[in-house]
């Protein structure tokens, strides 16, 4: 229904409402009566996909710099004390299509929490001295990823799947990228993208929508202007079939996957159920087969990544280097099984209940609700209520899962990344074949 220009929807006896402030953020809120906390999630629609040549790593650098100080909170310490001093928590994360800042505070401190979020986004200092010191911190972060075989394998898989463009490269960039970023380039990126009108703010707790909207208006003010779009995703897969990294480790890291669906694809919920059957959780097929039955891995799971115009399904595992061929064979067999056989009804029901139950449990936490409504408002074509999402999960049937698996799981689509000692990296491409 529409009331006063706002659209309201039920989410299991709860409501969310939207308001687009004039030349300011879009506000979406959900009232949770009796909640003792208020969570705020602010999505700046600026991620690494917006980086121009010569700016690689600037979105992540910008996120780091906001925590160095703002006009009202001039130091990292004053920012952290403002939130932690009342028992709250806060953080931020840069993705390829957005950067999210979140805070969770006791309800009486919600104005303080909103003020800090607004300061971080709209009024950061961006001093030269802070840029110099944070540059060194980010370089150490990059080195830590390269030294971690699991992280390094993910970096290799991204380039195998998405190529060397914005979706394939590491969000942090490489050392040379960070060394080459000038203070002016960082400030220009902030001016171009960190605008109130380029932000979605989700507020969840025991407060009315008008109250949430007022807090956002006070903290963010206004600031409009066109923000450039990002280049379209390449045709996937866009990189080499196999990427390898040599590391003298006692465990090999394996990532294997296929192109999947963009986030608003009509079959997105079918893909979520397929993934739950395949490798999401300890009762999934991969866990029971690769770990429990064959004893080939300690960690094995599957997951999804989705963007506005692209996506991928990935299986990752840590195995004995000598067992890489056997692990690949077992993983590929499970992909082929989904392609060739309908999922039994009892197993399908279990996977759907796993997804539905997990979603409902998360709705008791203000931070998860803020992520649910804020992430959808920022990144999707629509905001589903929880009931609507549950209905879409329930509507998935075995025939749809098998049909989708048949479309996704083909030999030409497979991409593989492995990090292991050099002698275990030979001959991998010939093993990258699904059973007939």
Residues of each region from the PLM?
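Phosphate/diphosphate-binding glycine-rich loops and adjacent basic-rich segments that engage nucleotide
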Residues: 240-250, 254-257, 266
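A conserved active-site cap/scaffold subdomain adjacent to cofactor or substrate pockets
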Residues: 271-280
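Charge-rich, well-structured scaffold segments of protease-associated domains
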Residues: 12, 16, 20, 31, ...
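N-terminal amphipathic/basic-hydrophobic helices that include classical n-h-c signal peptides
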Residues: 1-14
């Amino acid at each position: 229904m529409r009331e006063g220009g706002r659209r309201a929807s039920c989410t299991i006896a709860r409501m969310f409402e939207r308001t687009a402030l004039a030349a300011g953020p879009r506000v979406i809120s959900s009232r949770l009566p009796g909640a003792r906390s208020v969570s705020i999630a602010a999505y700046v629609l600026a991620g690494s996909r917006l980086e121009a040549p010569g700016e690689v790593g600037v979105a992540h650098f910008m996120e780091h710099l906001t925590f160095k100080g703002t006009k009202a909170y001039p130091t990292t310490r004053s920012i952290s004390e403002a939130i932690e001093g009342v028992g709250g928590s806060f953080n931020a994360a840069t993705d390829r299509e957005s950067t999210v800042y979140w805070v969770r505070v006791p309800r009486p401190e919600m104005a303080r929490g909103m003020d800090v979020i607004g300061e971080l986004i709209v009024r950061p200092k961006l001093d030269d001295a802070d840029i110099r010191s944070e540059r060194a911190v980010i370089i150490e972060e990059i080195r830590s990823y390269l030294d971690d075989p699991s992280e390094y394998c993910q970096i290799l898989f991204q380039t195998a799947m998405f190529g060397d463009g914005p979706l394939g490269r590491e969000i942090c960039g490489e050392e040379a990228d960070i060394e080459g970023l000038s203070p002016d380039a960082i400030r220009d990126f902030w001016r171009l993208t960190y605008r109130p009108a380029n932000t979605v703010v989700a507020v969840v707790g025991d407060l009315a929508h008008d109250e949430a909207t007022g807090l956002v208006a006070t903290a963010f003010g206004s600031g409009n202007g066109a923000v450039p779009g990002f280049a379209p995703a390449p045709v996937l897969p866009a990189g080499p079939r196999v990427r390898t990294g040599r590391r003298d480790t006692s465990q090999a890291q394996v990532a294997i996957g296929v192109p999947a669906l963009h986030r608003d694809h009509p079959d997105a919920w079918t893909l979520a159920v397929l993934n739950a059957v395949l490798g999401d959780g300890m009762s999934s097929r991969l866990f029971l087969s690769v770990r429990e039955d064959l004893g080939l891995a300690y960690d094995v799971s599957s997951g999804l990544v989705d963007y506005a115009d692209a996506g991928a399904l990935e299986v990752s595992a840590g195995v004995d280097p000598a067992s890489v061929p056997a692990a690949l064979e077992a993983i590929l067999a499970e992909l082929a099984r989904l392609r060739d056989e309908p999922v039994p009804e009892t197993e399908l029901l279990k996977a759907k209940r796993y997804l539905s139950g997990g979603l409902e449990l998360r709705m008791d936490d203000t931070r998860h609700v803020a992520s649910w409504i804020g992430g959808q408002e920022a990144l999707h074509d629509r905001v589903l209520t929880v009931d609507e999402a549950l209905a879409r999960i329930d509507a998935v049937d075995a025939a749809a899962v098998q049909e989708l698996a048949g479309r996704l799981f083909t030999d030409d689509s497979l991409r593989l990344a492995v990090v292991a000692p050099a002698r275990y990296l030979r001959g991998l491409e010939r093993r990258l074949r699904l059973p007939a």
